[in-house]
């Protein structure tokens, strides 16, 4: 499921072929695939499998911050699927410092949004291999994405996002925001 989402990031269409390729590989290997099947001891005794792989799917990670009910908040999945009403001034709080925050920042900036990418690490994308990271940071710079490092999201309200600097514990407020 998340592979289908990954292909929606700009420049990541290659992920679109992964499910088909994996399905073909499993068919070639003679793997029996059962979808939407409850797994219990009776099924295991009946089928006597060599191995069982349970794919349970995923859900977006829910933000647990103060002010959710006051602000316009969406998750990455909604943005990628085109299900989000995105304003012109966006703050992305990226606690993972990986592909997702940078991909969303690029997508929204290319769609005309003023984007501030707030990360709690040393830099946006710090978990991405260096050769890819440098080029992507350059792209975000060219698009005017403002990257603010070392800040952790604490709360939000209708127009502001409240952060704590992770190195000195000072308060950081990002104002005039339409979307979080």
Task: Describe the predicted segments one by one.
Residues 86-98:
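Beta1/beta-strand and adjacent pyrophosphate-binding region of the FAD-binding site
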Residues 66-67:
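Beta-rich extracellular carbohydrate-active architectures
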Residues 5-12:
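Short glycine-enriched, charge-decorated loop/helix-capping segments at active-site entrances
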Residues 15-61, 70, 75-81, 85-86, ...:
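A Rossmann-like FAD-binding core segment of flavoenzymes
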Residues 1-3, 62-63:
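Short acidic/His/Gly/Ser-rich catalytic and metal-binding motifs that mark active-site loops
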Residues 101:
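N-terminal Rossmann-fold NAD(P) dinucleotide-binding loop
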């Amino acid at each position: 499921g998340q592979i289908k989402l990954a292909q929606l990031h700009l420049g990541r269409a290659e992920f679109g072929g992964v499910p088909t390729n994996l399905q073909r590989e499993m068919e070639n290997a003679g793997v029996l695939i059962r979808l939407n099947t409850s797994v219990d001891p009776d099924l295991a005794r009946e089928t006597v499998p060599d191995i069982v792989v349970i794919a349970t799917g995923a859900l977006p990670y829910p933000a647990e911050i103060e002010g959710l009910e006051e602000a316009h908040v969406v998750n990455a999945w909604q943005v990628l699927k085109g299900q989000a009403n995105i304003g012109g001034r966006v703050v992305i709080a990226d606690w993972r410092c990986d592909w997702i925050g940078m991909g969303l920042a690029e997508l929204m900036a290319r769609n005309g949004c003023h984007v501030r990418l707030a990360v709690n690490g040393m830099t946006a994308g710090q978990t991405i291999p260096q050769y890819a990271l440098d080029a992507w940071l350059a792209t975000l710079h060219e698009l005017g994405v403002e990257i603010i490092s070392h800040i952790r999201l604490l709360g939000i309200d209708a127009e502001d996002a409240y952060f704590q600097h992770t190195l000195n514990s000072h308060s950081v407020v990002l104002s005039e925001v339409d979307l979080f």
